């Protein structure tokens, strides 16, 4: 049973990395959505000085939609407030000097917005939600269902959106090249929806060093389309990660639980023998400095007995208040529940 720990501000120092590795963390995850080369080099150096052959996972951005990186404003959106979403190409040419009109540019092109029937948009793993109430050739007019702060890079979910042909982004190419050149041996791709998303990575790695033997590629299952296409996805992947942080806003809270266990049952019945990793919302209580809850422990127990082969800790270890304690508890639970 694997433990994957995401490295972030609260776990990037040598002391915490030593505790992680000493307490059975199998894989250290670097989130390339927030790529800081100097920091990543330091983490690799620290980790490999503790354990030379520690496995490192490079988690790529994939087709994740975000607030456009050239958005230079930060503002709060209140409950029941009207906002306007637009594409990155439109935002680059419009001139909005009206502070009373809140425009949120997304990292997609205008043709994607126009060809899709977008009804809902959510952000930050579903903690901010918007209902689309009107659409023209430039904007999606939406109303906020809760409050929160908007800034560049914030992750967005648009359930059922068709992003068109699968293409490896320039950002992912840069991340992949850096990962391979720094001897990272596990790649996980976000927002995989078809086998083409993984085959694109395999082809690109060949152009870097021509050798795929020592590199494992994991697919993150986190959209409705990925769930429908899981058979073709697992056929070309070395393992899958059921990424619940995005699966919940993509599928809905109630449906996402059904989808998780339907997928696990299908994999078990087909004698799937590769890694199945459960990610995010594992021990969220500890992320916020509290003790774990009985429901979290029951969930871990259920997953272990449903055939998963590991857990991926995200915010719990990257920004959580108890990163080492979280790893120690998960290790203890795995030992107890695997019997």
Regions flagged by a language model, labelled:
Residues 1-339:
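Non-catalytic helical/linker scaffolds that mediate oligomerization, partner binding
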């Amino acid at each position: 049973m694997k433990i994957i720990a995401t490295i972030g501000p609260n776990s990037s120092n040598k002391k915490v990395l030593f505790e992680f590795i000493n307490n059975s963390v199998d894989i250290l995850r670097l989130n390339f959505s927030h790529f800081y080369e100097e920091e990543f080099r330091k983490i690799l150096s620290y980790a490999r000085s503790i354990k030379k052959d520690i496995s490192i996972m490079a988690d790529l951005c994939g087709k994740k939609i975000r607030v456009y990186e050239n958005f230079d404003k930060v503002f709060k959106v209140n409950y029941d407030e009207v906002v306007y979403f637009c594409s990155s190409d439109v935002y680059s040419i419009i001139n909005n000097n009206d502070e009373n009109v809140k425009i949120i540019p997304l990292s997609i092109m205008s043709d994607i917005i126009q060809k899709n029937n977008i009804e809902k948009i959510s952000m930050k793993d579903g903690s901010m939600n918007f209902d689309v109430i009107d659409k023209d050739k430039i904007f999606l007019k939406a109303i906020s269902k809760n409050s929160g702060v908007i800034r560049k890079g914030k992750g967005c979910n648009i359930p059922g959106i068709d992003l068109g042909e699968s293409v490896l982004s320039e950002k992912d190419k840069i991340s992949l090249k850096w990962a391979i050149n720094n001897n990272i041996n596990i790649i996980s791709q976000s927002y995989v929806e078809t086998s083409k998303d993984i085959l694109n990575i395999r082809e690109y790695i060949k152009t870097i060093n021509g050798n795929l033997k020592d590199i494992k590629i994991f697919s993150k299952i986190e959209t409705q389309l990925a769930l429908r296409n899981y058979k073709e996805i697992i056929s070309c992947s070395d393992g899958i990660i059921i990424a619940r942080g995005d699966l919940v806003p993509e599928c809905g809270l109630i449906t996402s639980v059904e989808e998780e266990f339907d997928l696990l049952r299908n994999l078990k019945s087909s004698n799937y023998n590769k890694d199945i990793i459960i990610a995010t919302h594992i021990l969220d209580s500890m992320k916020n400095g509290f003790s774990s809850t009985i429901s979290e422990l029951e969930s871990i127990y259920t997953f272990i007995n449903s055939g998963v082969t590991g857990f991926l800790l995200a915010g719990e270890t990257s920004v959580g208040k108890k990163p080492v304690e979280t790893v120690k508890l998960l290790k203890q639970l795995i030992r107890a529940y695997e019997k």
